[in-house]
Amino acid sequence: MLEISDRVNITAPSAQGLFYGMVTVVQSYYADGAVPCGKARDYAYYPIRSGMIDVARAYIPLEYVEEITKYFAYFKLNEIHLHINDIGQNGYNIFRLESDVEGLTATDGYYTKDEYRTYQKRMLDYGVTVITEIDTPAHSACFASVVPELMLDANHLDISKPETVEFVKSLFDEYITGDDPVFVSRKVHIGTDEYSNAKKEVVEKFRAFTDHYIRLVEGFGKQAVIWGALTHAKGDTPVKSENIIMNAWYNGYADPATMIC
């Protein structure tokens, strides 16, 4: 509740609500040069208000990412999703975080673990949760230079190999385990978009792969976020759906109408 007379009074059930009330006052003054008297009750219609930035294909210094994140807070968005690995122009392979895997980290710009951890914690003070995505088993060209034997082709991991499953697990272990994990948020994006559905055998392996990593991150107390892909990869292998967040970006990959029970 925002009440303005000869003084500004903001009441809210949480610190986040108080922060948004303050933002409303600042927005009003910035727009009109004054703050009108009266009462206003405001609340978020959607619990998740998010946007994604692809920092893989185009390196953005962390200082600027932080500035953008503060703008998210100003417009009352409460999550920012960072896509950190992909394939760049001219075959340049990109992984934007410092990694224990030798040769994996991008050479044209990356974020150290310490500075990335600090950035995420600082943004929580602005009410914005940073969700980091490691995209596998497609969009995986960045791994070709370090584990070429695990690649199906230039951009896809070979998920038929047990060694691939162990390699991807080691990546998540590196970033979500420990007393002070690199990924601060309880939510972890595991990717899973745009893999082949040309053969039923591949589809079933992809579904098993997706289910495996959902359960893996949950085992560390995290909530899995995935790209919608299971309409594209329709099959028999069950994939856990309870308490999962799905980013449905294209109906050809995940059609909401066919997924409603």
Where are these regions (language model features)?
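Active-site neighborhood of glycoside hydrolase catalytic domains
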Residues: 148-245, 249-260
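Feature activates predominantly on carbohydrate-active enzymes
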Residues: 2-189, 212, 216
